[in-house]
């Protein structure tokens, strides 16, 4: 090997290292901009709904066939998270939940604020769907949005009733949502259970009123046994 070949062999690793460093530097410089676009604050109202309806965003939320139970979905794979990103993006709260349910055409949305002394959850949400497919679609969409917007400290999602046809329960920690068919919702009446509570039990425990056996209701056909009463007008 001549002198030219030896020089080329010595310079090749240096040139390769410099090329890799420049590519990595450009990628790191572009990362804050991409992260800022991902976590920019959006209003919960109509503007947020329009942002959610963009093709890329909707495709990412509705591309998978079923519900997931793990907290980190495929949306967040490979994406670095930071404490700053956890606090600058839109917050997944009760207003966001109601907006998402309305966007998915949920019916008869009922939000109940649970007293703190119960130590169960902050909000209890009950909604109705038109079919089993509608219930699962609403639950899947809300869960995907939660995973996309959640912070590191937020709890994992718990889903109950994935194999049922008429009732789904999704526990987000601070919010618990029940998605039910109208007939199932009418049977269990969760609204009364969580609003009336003990008062509803008291009403059920009241004994029915009965009338005495000698109580006469109506006019008898045989009036012979009725003693006439003389009325005096003054």
From Swiss-Prot:
GO terms for biological process: negative regulation of mitochondrial translation; negative regulation of ribosome biogenesis; negative regulation of translation; ribosomal large subunit biogenesis. Pfam families: RsfS. The keyword Hydrolase does not apply. GO terms for molecular function: mitochondrial large ribosomal subunit binding; ribosomal large subunit binding. It is found in: Mitochondrion matrix. It comes from the Eukaryota. Keywords: Mitochondrion, Ribosome biogenesis. Its main location: mitochondrion. GO terms for cellular component: cytosol; mitochondrial matrix; mitochondrion. Residues 63-88 are annotated as: Disordered. Gene3D superfamilies: Beta Polymerase, domain 2 (3.30.460.10). The keyword Mitochondrion applies. Associates with the mitochondrial ribosome large subunit (39S) via interaction with MRPL12 and/or MRPL14. The interaction generates steric hindrance that is expected to prevent premature association of the 28S and 39S ribosomal subunits. Interacts with intermediates of the mitochondrial ribosome large subunit (mt-LSU) (recruits the mitochondrial ribosome and complex I assembly factor AltMIEF1 and NDUFAB1); regulates mitochondrial ribosomes assembly. Interacts with MRPL12 and MRPL14. Required for normal mitochondrial ribosome function and mitochondrial translation. May play a role in ribosome biogenesis by preventing premature association of the 28S and 39S ribosomal subunits. Interacts with mitochondrial ribosomal protein uL14m (MRPL14), probably blocking formation of intersubunit bridge B8, preventing association of the 28S and 39S ribosomal subunits. Addition to isolated mitochondrial ribosomal subunits partially inhibits translation, probably by interfering with the association of the 28S and 39S ribosomal subunits and the formation of functional ribosomes. Belongs to the Iojap/RsfS family. PANTHER family: IOJAP SUPERFAMILY ORTHOLOG, MITOCHONDRIAL ASSEMBLY OF RIBOSOMAL LARGE SUBUNIT PROTEIN 1. This is Mitochondrial assembly of ribosomal large subunit protein 1. It comes from Homo sapiens.
